[in-house]
């Protein structure tokens, strides 16, 4: 808002003058006057925020509204993803992604007409509802803004705006009603800890500095924020520089300092500009200088612009830089509180620490300490970046969980992908995997799991992030920023980086992981400063939580995330379980070379016709085209190529890679795994015999998927193609009934491949599930597909949300059921079934009842007559990134049904394997085998 007149600009010589100025400013302002506030932070400026501000000024002038409306540039609102942000006060109407072209409409509709421009409102992705007011935006609604509370209400360089919101009231309070010792005691009682990363108690640091002998002492603000993805301090300085100055003034009074420095990197030109203006205006009013507010306290402040060296965030390196020396750490003790700047006692805190002081003093230690956890008090600002829907700044109480930040405030992971990890504490922090989503974010909790608070950077990663490459990225940064003073940091990080680079290039060796762990620990233990002591953290934490990714890079020469170029041909190919060359065959199809495309598919996948119809195509989820608009229809193109050959009526001849061998191989199970293994073994010259318990080949393809979705002639065609390659299939041969493993070995088979599938039905574990009319989903589909006469009632309920549940429901409808319902305990968004199949079910008028779970099956003479269900609501998120369903108390009701088909998963049936034969069953219900070769103990 505009500055006041000359009477508001005189020197303040007492506490009464400050109060009088505040009252004068407030008298001159109409709280009900319209004010168009525009985010003026660097991010929104990059979006065109300054041009937007000028456009509003011009349009308001054109409409003759200068007396009715002001235009004000403000600090960061936090929701940087949606900039430029415009908020209309006093109503607090929240507009996002506003452009210069939108200005005339906003002025005419909102300022003149009092109507909201709907298309500029923020739409809540969870509800699809447009949000009108800023306090309704979920990103802002769930925060506790203390340091950022003035952002959006003050013009950053306008000292009167700041004073009007109790600016410098805390300084006045300590100068005229508190002794320095009382100030320190208040900060100690509040439990404020340094927000720069180490978390050292602020009050204790102030006390150390005050108690150090010497007449000359210094206050220093560490504004050298250099973490990748971090911009908390920059936004505070840009949006409310007076808040930082007031905190520094109070600290200077408490420790007895007369001079101070703000060390800010020159890469923050807007922050530097605002700080210079703020210092100048404070000096004009007598809030910085000699005898502040007529007291005997004097303080002078200078800005020192740093060159951007990351190591200068370390306090002794920072002090050396202020002194004009090269920014390099020194050994401690003595600590800066004893011998700091020019050998004098010096207190160093970062921007956010000083910005906490005003609210702490005005509200009192008790109120401040009521926020947060036992060991971490107050709020913390985080910069939320990476694979997250809502990037930006957020301020939450200490102890808020990672889950709340990522899903409730951050809006979850884009494109429905899964959360993989969060890098906390910047390049020197550690990553947190999904099992730590419910970890409270505080100093102690993060340290216990190998991470750190740092300055507040939080980088979110999804399944497309390679953790090895991420560790290499952060180590490359810290190695490049190492000052080189100590050998462990200078040489050790270089050697670690070389190893990581080799691994990402596919040149990793056995023992590299152990060497990284050993070197990382040595560097942590022997480095001189905090940079070296923490820089191995990303490597150590990724090995701890994602060791299997390192092993995949080294042993399998694969990057599971498809990021490392040397190990990845294309993301789609890398994601495919059989590494099918989707890039190649789509290109061949586009060139109308259909036979070559099919041959390329069959290099890795002989089930082209089947997978073109029944595959869940994870390749499309990773398709680069999907980041622009929609993924390429990779699965449909595979189907097209396979159908083209079948229509031509000429099956491709067999192709063998090696000459025939004498060693025979037995395969148990003619499902997709068994057929694929037989095909590749046959191509390499091995005679293969498949023993299948069912009367048909195909396994779950034949008996688990309905023919209307996967026609039997398609299965038969692909099986016939496989059998050309020296493969024999014997049906009605069940392991444990018709033969044993010993029988196969006695018959001369040199190896046995077990591909039994998962044909078992997990139980619901509710009363009544053994009644007549309860047909387990896998059994139901198998019986129908094998031609058995399966009767269903008029009203069928299918329990579950997967593909088998959808198939069972559609099959029940075809068997004569008049009404079919699917009962699923979560919402449609969490449903694991293929979206296309869900749509087909809805088109067939199948009811899908979401947020519902069965609790009891009602019977009459042993037969189903109904089912009791309870309504569910979504609670917290689980490790898969889905919200847990929670029963709604008292919401039980009865569904009238006569057939229930439970389908809540499937499991392997391993009763044919005996421990006395040498087989071992794991706790998860699978056969124990080597994790790399999958060989059993036999």
Name these PLM-found stretches.
Residues 770-794, 877-938:
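FAD-site-proximal beta/loop scaffold in flavoenzymes
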Residues 664-689, 805-813:
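N-terminal Rossmann-like FAD-binding beta1-loop-alpha1 element of flavoenzymes
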Residues 659, 663-668, 716-766, 856-868, ...:
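Feature captures the FAD/FMN-dependent oxidoreductase FAD-binding
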Residues 687-730, 782-784, 809-856:
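Rossmann-like dinucleotide-binding cores of NAD(P)H-dependent redox enzymes
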Residues 143, 272-398, 410:
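Hydrophobic alpha-helical positions that pack around
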